[in-house]
Amino acid sequence: MVNTDFEKIHLNQSKNYGRMRIADSGLGWKASVTNNASASNNAPFLLPSEEILASQWSRGSRGYELRVQTKNKGVVMLDGFDVEDFANLKQELQRNFQVNLEHKEHSLRGWNWGKTDLARNELVFQVNNKPDFEIPYSEISNSNLTGKNEVAVEFNLDGANSKAGDEMVEMRFYIPGTLENETTPAVKNEENGEVKEEETEEISAATVFYEQLKDKADIGQVAGEAIVSFSDVLFLTPRGRYDIDMYPTSLRLRGKTYDYKIQYNQIERIFSLPKPDEAHHLLVIQIDPPLRQGQTKYPFLVMQFAKEEEIELDLNVSEEEYNDKYKDRLKKSYDSQTHLVMSHCFKGLTERRLVVPGSFQSRFLQPGISCSLKASEGYLYPLDRCFLFVTKPTVYIPFSEISSITMSRTGAGGVSTSRTFDMDITLRGSNQSHNFGSIEREEQETIENYCLQKGLRIKNEEKLAKAMLAKAMNETADDDDDADVDMGSAGDDDDESADDDFNSGSDSDVAEEFDSDASVSDAEMSDSNQEPPQKKPKNE
């Protein structure tokens, strides 16, 4: 058996290069040991010979690229070949796998319009009958109709451990025009012999492309059977009803307009919370990266269930598979309230901790309190390690990020007569804060005590205002006492007897010195107070 090796080859656009080997049993690749590749990335890649269908040779980003079309493993991209490798590579593929190496040239016109070809393993965008670029279906996470003639295609994102950098996350195709879609076949009326013509319905070309891409890329379904499925689940965000299919490593949300695929490693937290209305239960899923509908992002999925709704189901796995993989995580069959069953399935398949209410209880013995965030009304849940506001927008505030919490209440004339209060949560290291308003006054003491138990810094503006007012009043009283002491006997004028020597009617020395009329006698003054004499009548 003769093997042929090629050095410094990159597999599926990986940053690490390695060695590619062709043998009669198949094709293999292994990362180079000297390339600082981590142990997790050093696992060899093996492609059996029976999987290989076709191969193409074209220019790549690191030289020349070999694209291998497979039966069940998508498209395999191997980049980094030299132009001299073409003849040897073609000979080896033909000798070992009876596969012809086809030479393809890419279009370099730079046009942004062309034709799409939905091939077996990838979407090919062609310009002037030459491939302009290819998108493997395995790289497509979601696709949605964002308009009558527009289709958005979202791509998988690299893992959280990869270096931060620029990355294409979405591409949109504008597809004008309509196509005829047959809806009703021709029917002959036996009574009068008339033939009813078949009815046709026009459908947009964008819709046809979207449906075909969804089928090709398996966006609406996953190879294999779902482990468990839930139908017609009400979502508060994003709004609508979705069917949920849960697979070993991912789940599907299928709605009337949007379909989503969510990997379990995207799920960060799961909250199971009873609604304070005592009629519903909420299941909140935090995901990163978030779901997207156009420009709108949804980092939280909020499901609502009737509290008394029940479901009965069995896992769609064999007894052997259940014992090997799921025995310690799931039950073989369920017959209980729907929210309990779904919470247990999410916890078991994602292997994430299920967050439930802690020790906090409102005055109505509920784990949440009614309040408002800006113009939105909802419920605030003080949990063991965080605050969570639902439903729209859903806000997650871990205690570790809280700098301080300010309680404020405003009434007329500076006196607190309001029936509600506001709670402002300031975050560490930023000026960002969340203001929760319209909280019932009776809940304030309970929330304060709970926050103090969690070691959070509390500021009560009402208590501060009362303390400042009391301090100001004490200072005013002290000032009055000091003023009485400084005035001495002057403060006792009311208790002293009248001054016998004082004659209010006599002229003072000051008047004699400065008033030229000071010598006027009392008699003259008394005369001046009398009425003036009447005028004598004129002589006629």
From Swiss-Prot:
The keyword Transcription regulation applies. Residues 475-540 are annotated as: Disordered. GO terms for biological process: DNA repair; DNA replication-dependent chromatin assembly; DNA-templated DNA replication; nucleosome organization; pericentric heterochromatin formation; positive regulation of RNA polymerase II transcription preinitiation complex assembly; silent mating-type cassette heterochromatin formation; subtelomeric heterochromatin formation. Its main location: nucleus. GO terms for molecular function: DNA binding; histone binding; nucleosome binding. It is found in: Nucleus; Chromosome. GO terms for cellular component: chromosome, telomeric region; FACT complex. Residues 476-502 have a biased composition (Acidic residues). It holds the Pfam family PH1_SSRP1-like. Disulfide bonds: none annotated. InterPro entries: PH-like_dom_sf, RTT106/SPT16-like_middle_dom, RTT106/SSRP1_HistChap/FACT, SSRP1-like_PH1, SSRP1/POB3, SSRP1/POB3_N, SSRP1_DD, SSRP1_sf. Keywords: Chromosome, DNA damage, DNA repair, DNA replication, Nucleus, Transcription, Transcription regulation. Gene3D superfamilies: 2.30.29.150, Pleckstrin-homology domain (PH domain)/Phosphotyrosine-binding domain (PTB), Structure-specific recognition protein (SSRP1). Forms a stable heterodimer with SPT16. The SPT16-POB3 dimer weakly associates with multiple molecules of NHP6 to form the FACT complex. In contrast to the orthologous protein in animals and plants, this protein does not contain a HMG box DNA-binding domain. This function may instead be provided by the HMG box of the associated NHP6 protein in the FACT complex of fungi. Component of the FACT complex, a general chromatin factor that acts to reorganize nucleosomes. The FACT complex is involved in multiple processes that require DNA as a template such as mRNA elongation, DNA replication and DNA repair. During transcription elongation the FACT complex acts as a histone chaperone that both destabilizes and restores nucleosomal structure. Belongs to the SSRP1 family. This is FACT complex subunit POB3.
